[in-house]
Amino acid sequence: ACIEKYPNRKLYALTPNFRGVENAVNAGITNISYVISVSESHNKANIRRTHEESLAELQKIMDTFPQADICVSLATVFGCPFEGIPPIQKPVDFAKRVYDMGIRSICLADTIGIADPKQVRETITAMLAALPGCEFQIHIHDTRGMGLVNTLAAIECGITTVQSTLGGLGGCPFAPGASGNTATED
């Protein structure tokens, strides 16, 4: 019933599993953001799956719901509460894996809000060079008050889709101390 109230809005469902996608599609939402952490330890803590299990489930989702517009949201691109800051090549290589599966939209998530503008620029530049046909989005948490400048750095690199939340809501249960997303109103 809610979807009919907002016919000119693009709603999407953020989900880490097949059941979430199934529920979204059954509710009339076909814009899906499927979450996989670049950090395997965070992926196991957050959604209780290995990388291989998450990728296999992504393939099952793609096969079962061809009408779904899937964006893979890569969590912990800029840092992980368990593994620290990854070398830039690690998220680039993971993005290549989902791109090779047929995904053409990837969201780069600063899950715990520790990125800085230099890291954002370097990561996006590397992603754009490695996957020139891919649409990239950005998802920044504002833990250290860097959300706006990191978002600006992403926009300056050519990112045109920014995920944000009203009032900076959000967070991650497996990222103690991490705040919500950059506030839309900012």
Label for each model-derived stretch:
Residues R9-P16, K44-E52:
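Core AdoMet radical
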Residues F18-K44, A56-T64, A68-D69, V77-I138, ...:
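Alpha/beta enzyme core
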Residues S39-H42, G168-P173:
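Short gly/pro/ser/thr-enriched loop/turn and capping motifs at secondary-structure boundaries
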